Amino acid sequence: MASATRLIQRLRNWASGQDLQAKLQLRYQEISKRTQPPPKLPVGPSHKLSNNYYCTRDGRRESVPPSIIMSSQKALVSGKPAESSAVAATEKKAVTPAPPIKRWELSSDQPYL
């Protein structure tokens, strides 16, 4: 491998303010160390470093269907008929978006209409 002459090396070292030839042999000095400190993970489902399988880290497995806190429907007890089910069925009417249409009556003075 070609290298600069001694005069050029000293001139280059003086201009840069440091010894550049000493750095050539240790050119990989900025590489990280072989032994790394253990990572500092936040506490959560994945904070364990071992025995941490993917299926236990998966957030989709932690989701559950919504739980019913309150319902407006009454659950029937087995063996008993519904209380006042006939009354409730007669009170309900069909929901219409407008008032009911008036029935047209034919005029009695013009029977052909």
Swiss-Prot record:
The modification N-acetylalanine is found at residue 2. The modification N6-acetyllysine is found at residue 40. One of its GO terms (cellular component) is respiratory chain complex I. It is found in: Mitochondrion inner membrane. InterPro entries: NDUA7. The modification Phosphothreonine is found at residue 96. It comes from the Eukaryota. It is a peripheral membrane protein. One of its GO terms (biological process) is mitochondrial electron transport, NADH to ubiquinone. Keywords: Acetylation, Electron transport, Membrane, Mitochondrion, Mitochondrion inner membrane, Phosphoprotein, Respiratory chain, Transport. Residues 31-52, 86-113 are annotated as: Disordered. Belongs to the complex I NDUFA7 subunit family. Complex I is composed of 45 different subunits. Accessory subunit of the mitochondrial membrane respiratory chain NADH dehydrogenase (Complex I), that is believed not to be involved in catalysis. Complex I functions in the transfer of electrons from NADH to the respiratory chain. The immediate electron acceptor for the enzyme is believed to be ubiquinone. PANTHER family: NADH DEHYDROGENASE [UBIQUINONE] 1 ALPHA SUBCOMPLEX SUBUNIT 7 (PTHR12485:SF1), NADH-UBIQUINONE OXIDOREDUCTASE SUBUNIT B (PTHR12485). This is NADH dehydrogenase [ubiquinone] 1 alpha subcomplex subunit 7. It comes from Pongo pygmaeus (Bornean orangutan). The gene is NDUFA7.
